[in-house]
Amino acid sequence: MLEKTTRMNYLFDFYQSLLTQKQRSYMSLYYLDDLSLGEIAEEFDVSRQAVYDNIKRTEAMLEEYEDKLVLLQKFQERQRLVAKLKQLISEEEHVNEEMKQVVEAIEKLD
């Protein structure tokens, strides 16, 4: 469950601008603020089932966006490569200063 929550948080960060205001509100309250379906339903004066359906549809949309745009996958790969570069640099005693600057520049991209 934690893995799904983490993935949804990442997907929401990357693709929230593609969602409607209601979808953003529901997802933010559910995943970021950790409100229950009942609490969200009460706040918006709708049924718990309506909130559940909206969140499930939005989750599917976020996964579809990721399938097409692969922003999260690219981000994770960049993170992996930067970590590997850092490890290689730390193992090497005399690393070119310019190489270190390139790694730092890559890190700042995210």
UniProtKB/Swiss-Prot annotation:
The record's annotation in InterPro entries points to:
RNA_pol_sigma_r3/r4-like (IPR013324), UPF0122 (IPR007394), UPF0122_fam_protein (IPR054831), WH-like_DNA-bd_sf (IPR036388)
Q: Which domain of life is it from?
A: Bacteria
Summary of the function given for this chain in its UniProt record = Might take part in the signal recognition particle (SRP) pathway. This is inferred from the conservation of its genetic proximity to ftsY/ffh. May be a regulatory protein.
Similarity-based family? Belongs to the UPF0122 family.
Q: What is this protein called?
A: UPF0122 protein BALH_3477
Name the lineage: Bacteria, Bacillati, Bacillota, Bacilli, Bacillales
